From Swiss-Prot:
UniProt keyword annotation of Ribonucleoprotein present: yes
TM helices/strands, residue ranges: none
Gene: rpmI
GO biological process, one term: translation
Protein name, as recorded: Large ribosomal subunit protein bL35
Family matches, as Pfam families: Ribosomal_L35p
Organism: Deinococcus deserti (strain DSM 17065 / CIP 109153 / LMG 22923 / VCD115)
Record key words, sorted: Ribonucleoprotein, Ribosomal protein
CC terms in the record's Gene Ontology section: cytosolic large ribosomal subunit
Molecular function terms from GO: structural constituent of ribosome
Coiled coil: none
PANTHER family reported for this sequence: 54S RIBOSOMAL PROTEIN BL35M (PTHR33343), LARGE RIBOSOMAL SUBUNIT PROTEIN BL35M (PTHR33343:SF1)
Amino acid sequence: MPKMKTLKSASRRIKITGTGKVMAFKSGKRHQNTGKSGDEIRGKGKGFVLAKSEWARMKLMLPKGK
């Protein structure tokens, strides 16, 4: 059986915490921020925990857990 490979697009968008939770990051922070408030831009920098129903699927995309 061949090695499991990491889905690179997923590795850039999500991460698995030390306790096994799956975190993602909010979109809309990279460019075109002139009309947004500072609170909005800072709020988009924080990650959030995905729903438990999605954890198993995301962990298949990241077999090494990174």
